[in-house]
């Protein structure tokens, strides 16, 4: 991304909400205009620029051109993580032996690798430099960073799937959630492995690139847990990951329903929470807006992809209103940008932030 855009995002992400800007306060606050940021990746980018998804994954020059184009087309949007080298959900699970089905015009499907909890005992933390798709990502990052820099742009953030998301792909989502209750010890061992995997993969990306200042962790499965199960099976592992990257901007994405987990999530060490439209922005702001920055939460499919520009502006205005005029808000979708999202609706989001 452009340095100016990154510095603007980082400044807001790391700023400490002052007493005057806290929810419920009436004091004045000197603040910047609302920043627009969007998580974008292979479900949206190839279709938007008019190339097959397989070309996007396999032809590095097409990948570079596509990412440069969206940045130039929407100069006021901070795209996260920005120039994201990914293969759908496949990078981390592939290192555990998960097979993948590839499609011409959509991201690959991941097939679970283990079918009994007894198989967890044989799993080891993979080497990002050698196992699965991770080494390909690392090698490509070194290649593409030079091309990105020639465009006076920069790769400032890297991403990884969270420990529960990776575990659920290795085991199967339903099976993983059942294991939480029936085989808690084996499940915790799996989560220890996937937690260390996320840490090592993020560190490897940081080491292969030259300018990284932020991490993005994505894990929707966390929202499927009760508060009690969250504290046992998610909170320690999330906290371990975020605490491993001191000095980095830490963004967490979860667009499942997490209104029952807002307070403990805010204590994991994250700076920015991107959450779904199924959580009320005003409630989230009142409860944790004094601790973290909120990023959201326009309905993705119904409004950002399928609505009119006027509907996008209306929902954006509500997000701004519900956060006291945009205090602590990074205006965004309630999740990643979905397929078929038109340019006019992203333009409308930017216009709403401007006003």
Identify the role of each PLM range.
Residues 84-126:
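A contiguous, low-structure linker/loop signature
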Residues 1-56, 63-66, 80-81, 102-109, ...:
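Active-site loop segments of alpha/beta catalytic cores
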Residues 67-92:
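Membrane helical hairpin/interfacial module
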